A protein has these predicted regions:
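Long, terminal "pre-/pro-" and other extracytoplasmic accessory regions
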Residues: 2-7, 11, 16, 20-167
């Protein structure tokens, strides 16, 4: 192959990566509890009446607005709701809580073990989606920022996800 063709093909091969990296950025704004919109608080309190809201963030990306609202239940357990604004109304799109790995369904544990990845989770986040899917985010020791594996569970079927779950 001639040098110009090789260079052109190489440039085209990395172009999508560069374009993805330059995609829409997420603007994150910390929101004081007293400043959370009443409509957001109302949706959260309807889902978890006993929750004490501790903190919130507004996330804006392209034309989407999310609120992440974190709090504590009366039993001391922590919970987080992710809300998306749709047509001027707020709706919960995900509910998250930390669980012990031993508390995860056996099918999820077995699916993770069968994946061939040697992960012993030190943190597990259970993320319930509004469509009935539950995502288990498994964090390995020394890697607190991103899950090392995600396993989905729906209708009695579990699978290791090849891509990061979008919410």
């Amino acid at each position: 192959m001639n040098r110009a063709l090789v260079l052109t093909l190489a440039a085209l091969a990395v172009a999508p990566v560069a374009a993805f990296a330059d995609g829409p950025k997420t603007k994150v704004t910390e929101v004081a509890v007293k400043d959370i919109p009443a409509a957001v608080t109302s949706v959260v309190k309807a889902a978890a009446p006993g929750m004490t809201i501790k903190e919130a963030e507004l996330k804006e990306r392209a034309d989407r607005r999310y609120y992440d609202v974190e709090g504590v239940m009366p039993d001391g357990s922590e919970i987080e709701f992710d809300l998306l604004e749709k047509n001027g109304a707020w709706e919960i799109v995900e509910t998250q809580r930390d669980i012990a790995w031993a508390s995860a369904p056996k099918l999820v544990q077995d699916t993770a073990a069968a994946s061939g990845k040697a992960i012993k989770p030190v943190r597990v986040i259970e993320s319930k989606q509004t469509d009935g899917i539950v995502i288990y985010e498994l964090f390995a020791a020394g890697k607190p920022d991103e899950p090392s594996m995600e396993v989905s569970l729906k209708d009695g079927k579990a699978k290791v996800l090849a891509e990061v779950w979008p919410h």
